[in-house]
């Protein structure tokens, strides 16, 4: 889910979303993204990433006090026999999360019971270092697949996209990019995360480098997706887990 802010300007409604979904991607192979989770409140509302058997990383803008975490999902409309549904025990937003500019848009969810890891449910490692521009990453989610209009898929969608340079990112969003954000995708448009993908993973070289956070529309030219820079939060993640 990308964060959606509606700006009404001269009678035109412009979507500035922080709710991400995949546009221009492809259906992931079944259970090929075993760390991907669906956050559910009677409906899918955000994605997340399993980082160990009892903790999930998502976006702070996805916060709800009670969340059911659905693991091992591929088709979220069917029970395929690989799923585990586990309620949250704790939901912890970053203490410096800013809902206005989406700085520090990261959140931890402690599961009420430990997930049983399997071929279909696996954790993803935290980054050992920040990823450089040009690194190709896998972005995934059940978010909207249309840049204009809505189509929410049942099957998990994947997108391969490169990390953009800091200058490309800041030029696309002047004054809006903090040190805790990076851009990934294609300045030409056509491929992006979108509403419903928010909180989900950006995995580069097998490590969780990003969390789907926000963007101006989806897959629009010169407006790439913006992601939380997980490498800046490894210490916070580790200390929060150890103290909870």
Curated annotation (Swiss-Prot):
Q: Which SMART domains match?
A: Tryp_SPc
Please list the residues that make up the propeptide. 16-21
Main location class? secreted
Q: Where is this site: Required for specificity?
A: 192
According to UniProt, the reaction catalysed is: Preferential cleavage: Arg-|-Xaa, Lys-|-Xaa
Per its record, how is this protein called by name?
Trypsin
Q: Which residues form the Peptidase S1 domain?
A: 22-242
Free-text cofactor note:
Binds 1 Ca(2+) ion per subunit.
| Family, as annotated | Belongs to the peptidase S1 family.
Q: Which UniProt keywords apply?
A: Calcium, Digestion, Disulfide bond, Hydrolase, Metal-binding, Protease, Secreted, Serine protease, Signal, Zymogen
| Record's signal peptide | 1-15
Q: A Pfam family this protein belongs to?
A: Trypsin
Q: Where does Ca(2+) bind?
A: 73, 75, 83
Q: What is its EC number?
A: 3.4.21.4
- Which cofactors are named for this entry? Ca(2+)
Question: Which of the seven top EC classes does this enzyme belong to?
Answer: hydrolase
- Tell me a GO cellular component: extracellular space
User: Which species?
Assistant: Xenopus laevis (African clawed frog)
């Amino acid at each position: 889910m990308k964060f959606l802010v509606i700006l009404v300007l001269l009678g035109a409604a412009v979507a500035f979303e922080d709710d991400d979904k995949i546009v221009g991607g492809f259906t992931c192979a079944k259970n090929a993204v075993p760390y991907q989770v669906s956050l559910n409140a009677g409906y899918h509302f955000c994605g997340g990433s399993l980082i160990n058997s009892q903790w999930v990383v998502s976006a702070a803008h996805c916060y709800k006090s009670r969340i059911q975490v659905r693991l091992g999902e591929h088709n979220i409309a069917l029970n395929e026999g690989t799923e585990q549904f586990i309620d949250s025990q704790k939901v912890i937003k970053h203490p410096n999360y800013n809902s206005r500019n989406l700085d520090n848009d990261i959140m931890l969810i402690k599961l009420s019971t430990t997930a049983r890891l399997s071929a279909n449910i696996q954790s993803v490692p935290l980054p050992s270092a920040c990823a450089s521009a040009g690194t190709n990453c896998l972005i995934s989610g059940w978010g909207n697949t249309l840049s204009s209009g809505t189509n929410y898929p049942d099957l998990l969608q994947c997108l391969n996209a490169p990390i953009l340079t800091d200058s490309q990112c800041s030029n696309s969003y002047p004054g809006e990019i903090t040190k805790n954000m990076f851009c990934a995708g294609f300045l030409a448009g056509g491929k992006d995360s979108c509403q419903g993908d928010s909180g989900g993973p950006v995995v580069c070289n097998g490590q969780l480098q990003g969390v789907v956070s926000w963007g101006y529309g989806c897959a629009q030219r010169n407006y790439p997706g913006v992601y939380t820079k997980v490498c800046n939060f490894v210490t916070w993640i580790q200390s929060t887990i150890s103290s909870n």
